[in-house]
Structures are given as C-alpha cells and as structure tokens.
Amino acid sequence: MHLFKRIALTLWLIISSTLAVVITEDRVDRGTISVNLGEVTVNSGASWSIINNAVTAFAGKINVQSGGGLYISSTSPLLALQVTLTSLLDSITNDGVISLDSRASLTASNYNLIGLSFTNNGEMYLAASGVLPSTMDLTAASWTNNGLIVAYQNQRSSGVLNLGTPLGAITNNGQICLYNQVYQQQTRIEGSGCITANKNSAIYISNAVLPVATTQNFYLQDSKSSMIVQAVSSTQTFNVYGFGNGNKIGITLPAVGIPPNPAYSYDVDTGILTVRAGLLSQKFNIGLGYYSLFFSVVTDNGAGLPSTILGSISYSGPVPSRNLPASCKIACKPVPTAPGTNPTEYTTTITTTNSAGNPLTETGVVDISTDSNGSWFTTTSIFPTTSQSSSSETVASSSQPDSSSTEPSAFPSSTGDSSAEPSITSDYSSSELSVVPSSASESASESSAEPSSASESASESGSESVASETSASESASEQSSTSESVSSEFASSDSSSEPSSASESSVESSSASEFVVPSSATETSVSESASESSAEPSSASESVASESAVSETSASESAAPSSASETSVSESAASSSASESFASESSVESSAVPSSASEFSTSESVASETPASETPASETPASESASEQSSTSESSAEISSASESSAEPSSAKSAISESASEFSAAPSSASQSSASQSSTNESSSQQSSAESSSTGTSSVSASAATSEYTATWTTTNSDGSVSTESGIISQSGSSFTTITTFVPDATSEYTTTWTTTNSDGSVSTESGIVSQSGSSFTTITTFAPDATSEYTTTWTTTNSDGSVSTESGVVSQSGTSLTTITTFAPDVTSEYTTTWTTTNSDGSVSTESGIVSQSGSSFTTITTFEPPVVCKRDDVNCGSSIGLSTPYYGNSSQPLSSTKMTDTSATQTVDSSLSSITDATTTQSVNSLETPVPTSGSGNGSNNGSDNGSNNGSNNGSNNGSGSGNGSNNGSNNGSGSGNGFNNGSDNGSNNGSGNASNNGSASGSGSDNGSDNGSDNGSDNGSNNGSNTDNGSNSGSDSGNGIDNGSGNGSSDGSDNGTTNGSGSGGESNNGSGNGSDNGSSPDNGSNNGSNNGSNNGSGDGIGTGSNSDTDNGSGNGSNNGSGSVNGSANGSGNGSNNGSNSGSNSDNGSNNSSGNGSSSDLGSVSGTGNGSNEGSSNESGANNGSNNGAGALPAATLSVVPSPSADSGSTSSASAMVIPNTNGSGKLLNGKVLTLSVLSSMVVVFL
C-alpha cells in the first residue's frame, strides 16, 4: 500500500512538472485555452495575457515573479470571466502583477481563488463592470498582503469583496483600494496596513466580535465613501482617516442614546467619536479638530450594506488636517491594460518556392482586430513581389495617408530629410488583392482608397486631360499590351490615415488622382475621378511622371538635355491637355517601391500635365530614341541617392500626402523610371533637377532573370541582439543582392503632456513617456495621475495695504499643485468672563477668573482678575483700603423673594438666592432694600447657638423663667426647636414662662417648625468648639460649614450626649433638626435627664441639681433656686459650660459669653429685650426674648456675582464676584445692614458682614 502511494505521488510529481507552464517571454492567447493542469510560473520580464477565455481554471500553484505579469481579461460585452483556483494544497505568490479584468462585460464575473496560502508583494487587480453583482474572493488559510490590491467596478452593485477564510485572520501591511466596491470583513485583521474607500465604496465590519488591530487604518478618501461596523457588546476603537465632507460612519442598528448618553458623542480631547445604539456602542478615532455643530445622524443605504435607518453619523464640514500613516500613502492605481487587448497590425515576410524552383519572398500586413461584439479576428494581406520577364506588374497600394504634416515621401533619401522618411504600417487594417490587366489604349486600374480632401479638390480641377500624340508614346506602343497593373486595396481607419492640412494644401494645384502615361494609342483619356488611377504601362522610356506643384513650366526649362536612359515625363497640373512632354524635372526615380519595410505603398505618381503650348514635341527628341530600349527594360524600383535627389520636395508641404493614398506606376521599357516632387513655383528647380538627372542617376536594366523588390529581413548583431532591416534587393535566379538598405527611422523617447477627450466630452490632461519614430508616436508609459487629497489648512495672505492676514480653508493637493476649494469665513470673536483652573509649579491647583476672547477654537486671556480680599470676622479695618461700607446680610436658608437693589443710576434685579446682579456699573451704591432683612435672631445665632445647645437651653430656661415647670418644658421644647437662628426661640419662649409665650411668639414667628430646623445649626458647633475660649460661639457657626452644613448630625445627639458627640456628623439642616427635636424633647425622660444634668452642675446652692427624676421636680427646683439673681446666671453659665461637652467646660468664660451673646447688645435689645444679660432672670419679658434669640444658628455665607455693564470709556465688559461673609464686631454687636455699597476694585468685589 505504501509502495502504491509512493508510486502515485511520484507519478503526480512527474505529471505536474511535465504539465507546468513557464512563461519566459511575452505571450498573448486569444479565445479558448486550457490551463487547468500544472503549475503556472511567469518569469521576471515576461507576461502572459489570456484574452476572452470564458473559464480559466487553475489547478496548481500560481507564481508571478517580480517584473512578470499574468493578465486575464475579456473584451466582449457578452463574455464574463470565470477565474478559479480550487486547490487547497497550492498557493498563490505574486511579486509582479496579476490582473483579472472583465470591465467590458455586461454579465456577472466570478473570481474565486482558494488556496493554502496567499502572499502578495506586488500588485493585484480584480475588476468587473458592476452591471450585475460579481464575486471576488481571495481565500486562504494563510493570507498576507504587503503590496497593493485593487478591487474595481465601473458601478457599485451588491457584490462584495471577501478576503481570507471566515473566522480566520488576514495580515494587511500594504494597501487595499476599493472603487465602487464593498469590502465585507469576516476575519480578524492584523497588521499596520490601510484599507481605502474611493468613489462610492464602503468598508463593512460585519463581525465586530473578531478583533481588528489598533494599528490597522481605514481611509475614507472621497465624500461618498462610508464605513459600517456591527453593533455588538464588545466595543472596539477603529482608526478612521478622511472623515468629513459628507461621508458616513455608522453601526448596524439605529443610533439611539439612553440618558445620560446621547446617540453619539465626540471627545474633543481624544478625537474619538462614539456611536451608540442603546447599550451597544462602537468607537472611531477620527482625530482632533471636529466641531459638534457639523455632526448629524443619517441613513447609509448603499448597495451591499445592511440598510439601517438613522444608523450613521455624517460630518458636513471639511476634513481637519491630519497626517496619514505610511500605508495609506501608497497610491491606488487604475487597472492596467492587458497586453494584446488593443487592435494591432504588423508587417511580415513569407518566403516560398515558386513553380520554377526559385524562392519567392512575399510581404504582407497582419491585422488583428475586434468586431462589434468584441470578438477577435485576424486578416493577412500579402503583397506579391515584382518578378517579371518582359512584362511588368505594378502593385498599387491605396490607403489613406497618415495625418502628419511630415508625411514621408516614397523615396528615402540618405540625407535624412524628414520628407523622405518611409511611412509606417499602421495605415493598413485589411486588404483585398485584385489584378486588373490593362491594355495599351486605356488606364483601367482602380484604387479603393479614397484620396484626401486635397486630392479630391485637385482631381476636380483637373478632371479632364487628353493626351495628344507624342513621339515617345508612338515608338513605345509595341510593348504596352504585355503589361499588367495589380491593384491591392487596403481599407484603413480614418483616424490613422487622414492626411494633414500641410499635405492637403500642397497638392491643391496638382491633379492628385490622375496619372496619364502616353501609350501607343494616339489619344489617352485620363481618369476623371479621384478614386481612380491609371497605371498604364507603355514602351516609352520609363514614363513615370513627376508630380509638381509648379504653376508654370516653360518648354525651354523642362526640355533640358537628358540621355535616353534618363528620360522622364513631366506633367504639370496647370494644363488640361498635354502634348509631347518629356521634360525631366527630377532625377529621383518613381517606382512601385514601398516607402518602408512595413508598408507596401509607394509614391503616387501624379501626372501633372504641362500645357501643350509650353512643351513642344520638337524639344523632346530624347524620348523618341529611348523607345528603342523599351523591349528589354522593366519597371525598376530605384531609390536615388542624395546626389540624385536634387529635386526633393523643398518643404513638408509637397504632394507627398498622395504617395500613400494612391499608387500608379507605369512600368516602361526604359532603363530608368524616375519621379520628382517639388513644391517650388519656378522652373529654376526643374533646371537644377534636369542637370542632376543627367549625371547622378544610375539605371537598372532588367533582364528576364532579374527582379528587384522591397523586403524585410532580420540581422543578428555582434552583441547577439536581433534587429529588423528593410530595403531593396535584386534577385537573379537564386542569387540575392541588397541594393539599398533603408535608413531606419530615428527613434527617440521623451516625456510629454497631452490632452484627451473623454466619452462624456470632458477634456483631461495626461502625461507620460512617448516614443517617436519618424511621424509615428507610441505611448510607452502613462503616468498615474497625482493622488488628489483634500484637507484643511491655514495660510497667510499679504493684503494690498501690506498687512498680513491669516485665512483657513479646504485645499486640494495634486502632486505639488494646490487649489483652494473653500475659504472659511473668519471666526466671530467674542469676549466673556469665565473661571479656569491653573496648576502651579508646586502641583497645587488654583482657580482664576478673568475676561477671555474666543475666536473659533482659540482662546486668549485679556484680563485676569485679582483674587478676592477675604476679611476675618472681627477685622474691622479689613476692606477699608478699597472703600467698602456697610455690608448686606444675606440668608440662603430663607431666600428673600424679589429682593431688589436700587442704584442711583439704574435698577438691578437680584434673584431669590441673591446669586447675581446683572448690568451693574463699575461702582454700585445701593440706597435701599425693598424687602427688609429680618434681624430677630440673625447674627446672634452664630455666637449664641454655639454655647446654647440642648443643655444650654435647659439651663437657660430653668434660670430664665419664674414660673413652675419652666425647666421641664424648656428642656423638652428646647431640643425640638433647633437650627434656625432668628426663628429659634418660638417654642422655647412659649413654654419658658407664664409671660413668655405671648411675647416670644410675636417676636419669633412660627413655633414647632422653627425648632425642627434649629437643632441642626444650633447644636453643631456646640460640641466640638464650645467652651474653649471666648471666640467659641462665633467660631462655632463659621467653622461648621458656612451655615449650610453647620451642625449637621449634631442635633440628633444633642440632647442626650450633649457635646461629647456634638458636631461629629454631617448632613443637611432639615434632617439634623428633626432628629434633634425628636430625641431631645420627645419624652419626659429626655427632659428629666436634661434637667438633671443641668441641675446637678448648675448651681452652687443646696439641692440645685436634685430634681433629676422628673420634669416637674427638676424644673421647679431649677427655677426656684436659679432665678434669684445675676449670680445665678453666672453659675448657670459655668455649669452650663461644663456639661456642654467634653471640650466646652474648661473655661468659665464660656458661660459668660453665652450670657453676653444672649443679649448684651443694645441693638439687639431694641428688638428682643434689653438688659438680657445682667437682669436675665428678673423679667419674664426679658427671658422670653432671650429665649427667642437663644440658639440662633450660624448665618450661612452667600456668594454674590456682579457683572458690570460696558463702560462708556473702555468699551469692554468686565465681571466680578464676591463672597458674603458673616461677621460681628468685637463686642458681639450686630451690624445694621440696610445700605450696601459694592465697590469694584481690580474687577473684584469684597463684601463682609
């Protein structure tokens, strides 16, 4: 079994190697071929072009070496390409060019290459028409691209490009370009390459679960390209370049946001665009410089994509400037033209043996072209050589001449004159060969090629010519009946054979289509049609007429002496009837000699008839004697040397354009046939030509065994190279002698630029390298157009006044050429006040404010405000240097409704929280407040509340009130009433004494509700800060959170723990107050404990603290003993302080401050009762008022922003902000705040209380 396998494997290797195809030189195959066996290798420098092969199935490895090319193409609209490789064991390696091109087809194409591995280091092109969806699959387990891959369609369809094995991986380090195509990702993508979408292409990431390397790049190169990514839970970030100008980025679900996340968002710091579909999202790194104003949600409904309504984001602005990665800079090239897909033609030479056993060499043109359906056919036209004995054949090749003003003449000259260069073979596409015998009396050969417009007009002007008797013709009549005229017709395309204007104008005066050779007949009618040329052989000595544009020819000038062997007939177009005309105008011979090796067409010998009156027969005896030689001579095809060409055309405007369109030759028995062309208007040139003809022309005498013809041959040079040469050879039997070798056209290559008119009528400019050989131009290389990119940039412009302005816009760059597409309108500059943070050198962060100017995305700081002056509580001199006066008291816990400040010059409205003042002038003097500021308890709370917690109240109550039960009620109610400074004593007062309630209520407003808020502020500062020094009360309020957070969490434990846990928590006022109230006074036990602790330490007398078991006893005991005098107050204070907290009892001043804070100010006495401190227990009213103010919370601070209006002198807007800081004077006296002056210094306002 193993032996069998080895044998089978060996046989397979032998068969594979045997069937392997190795391309070592350029090869073109058209039509059906089979390549389904063996390995295909294209060597470097070679190419294989397969054209119109419907199915190309590879069954082995494909290896294209560097510099090699494999081209498979279709030129038929009915034929689609099917290119497959279905071997799972073979590979594709491309280091050169692989091109699969069926753009001409109207049917669907199928490119399905499946192998073990795919490696592309060169260029690979997959092209289709897109009329129907096509398949483009490059599938391999190992897939690597380091070069260029182009997927192209003429128009977009639902067909897609698939790369790699599904769920596998591809490595792209090169460039993948899309034209009207969709790339559908089904694999992991690795590498640092680029995928570029051009001309309405799309990139579809259909399986976003498979990772895409963060080094892979996606480039949207035009405004119609897009990118779609599957919306899945695994979010990736894709590098996208070129996003803008209306192209799209999206996901496969509608873009919908879930608050707080919007449907899409752009991070200006990272340049990442996030597109969301609910909880699913994908991110795209589009770069910096985008403005949110230009983003919009759109629908991408392109062919080949899942149509998701409102699933994409478009950016209508230009693409911000961003450097492309190197892989995206690899140029996307157009699909190359396969060799052999353009119609072509070439000349070939065939050597055969004739019936006589002699070799016969034939030359012809091979034309390869297509029909209307794109199918190829080949036409070969053979030109017979002139092998005669006594008879002669003339091959008349008719084709329209090349449209060049430098059309070569029929006679190459050794001088290298451009007018004497041979023409080229591109004038022929097909041929018909016809032989028409001619008789002596008529000219019967016809040419199918129509002459140029100039020739037509010339034939019309000379449409009738009658040749009268000539002695030369009479004597030559013996041989005329044996001649034949062979006309070979070549139909060529109009584009390649139209004569140029220079050639047309040069033959207008000649009878371009008429060639009249005097025959043995007395009269010869001349062809009237431009499409006919008479090639009538005669026995005259080489009656080959020279064509001349000479308008006048005198007989004496044209009758210069010439020998019998040099006689030529000169006919001028100036006459419609010709008599004996033997004037020799030129020694240049005209014969049926092709003007080059690749073209069988000769100079048209147009007989311009000379007026009879100017050319008398008596002056032409030479031609008569020449008839004696007519029986032995043949039409020879001699090319004159430089000395023989004295009558060469003097300019490119000679009648040479007719030499390619019509050929008429009159083989004669003379030993020489010559034709001269001249564009001169005087006969002096004819004289000089006649002189040279008598000395410089060598005649060839033909014999029955000798023939001359033009042929092409190859020569191996000394270096081994093969070159092709053409010339005239003489054959005598089996002997060949080269008479003349044509000078090859000088070939030059150079770079040039030309314009091309496209099918839509637009004109495009192309550049490349062309090769010029004579008047033939061949395009060798067409430069790929410069890649055009558009980007946003900024430039400077010098204005007419010499100033320099900066502008921005979108420019288009093609190579080194820059074109401005859009110039952005300059950004509107605005100035406003703002606040920002600055990181100092030590790492700390400071906040600054000022005026900034914004122009687009550029910010400029105009003014930086100096930081505010902060005044401490008792610094009465603070602010005096800046002219501050009496402050305003604000309260954020109890907002003032519609509070207005009135200026002397304007009215400003302050919002309810007193947070800002608008349209203020630089200095504000506020005269009045429409809503007065309450003074009950305000200000007092900051000092009083700190010492005056739940214990403080119980002591105060027991000492303050004269009635029984005062203490017990005071304790229970004191706890629930907590927090709000100026409403604090409402419940306290009502239960504090028999007379207290009525006064207390009227002074304080509401009852229990006030107490609930009171606790949080009241007790917060009481614990931690209470009792350490005289400043304890005031600091208690200010240190505990600026009033708002003052005492948070303190109230709840205020009654029971009374100071030890006081101020430990944090929280809002309402929660603290409510908790404080419920714990502090909700039960008799709470009150009794409160009383007992207070009582036991409160006084120095006997039984002061014994009433600890019940509220009533405790209160009554406290009341009777405590309320006797001022000593009681001081004892109360000291006792109060000691129980008020672990930190509060160290100083007896704590109690005294508590007393003084409760009513020592005369200002406060006017509202709440005078003499409150020293006469604390003597008056019920005084006690009641004391209760109402007792425990006032700390006044919260408020922030006041001031924005002055533009001043008349500066024209700018400044702004300021200030901190309203609570304050009392050193003696605890509350400042009166009815008038506020806001002074602005360095754009900053400072206000203190």
From Swiss-Prot:
Keyword Signal carried by entry: yes
Alphabetical keyword list: Cell wall, Glycoprotein, GPI-anchor, Lipoprotein, Membrane, Secreted, Signal, Virulence
Function statement: GPI-anchored cell wall protein involved in cell wall organization, hyphal growth, as well as in host-fungal interaction and virulence.
Protein name: Hyphally regulated cell wall protein 3
Modified how: The GPI-anchor is attached to the protein in the endoplasmic reticulum and serves to target the protein to the cell surface. There, the glucosamine-inositol phospholipid moiety is cleaved off and the GPI-modified mannoprotein is covalently attached via its lipidless GPI glycan remnant to the 1,6-beta-glucan of the outer cell wall layer.
Taxonomy of the source species: Eukaryota, Fungi, Dikarya, Ascomycota, Saccharomycotina
Pfam short name (any one): Hyphal_reg_CWP
The species this protein was found in: Candida albicans (strain SC5314 / ATCC MYA-2876)
Primary location: secreted
